[in-house]
């Protein structure tokens, strides 16, 4: 257990660390711009007859930049209403969620993204705030690298050792 590579083997609900993904989809689809605003319901939003979302503060009107800065669950849930389930699912797959990465290491988890046929009316809203899916740390790092690299996925490399100029191992 102590030798387990948790970066690739443990899948978890990413929560707020995932919110940049629906933001990227919204910008990609041009459904919103960073200066557009969303009303965040003063901190409590009824998604369906028995499901409420809350923010940690009672926000009213927030720009997309502020929704990201303040990590507004309500803002992201409403943002997700601007795209359909299939677009979100395809975007998640594009970023590598729900599949193993390119590395060849044992015990890598693919995480879990349910097929859209198994989504509820509120799944898209919950996925946008990092719930109802599971991912690995490597998958999240790869997704962030796609954003940092202008939409291009750079294949990760596994480093076996590092040598100094005298070809002595400095890391193994």
Map each language-model feature to its residues.
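Beta-lactam-recognizing serine transpeptidase/beta-lactamase-like catalytic domain environment
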Residues: 1-16, 21-172
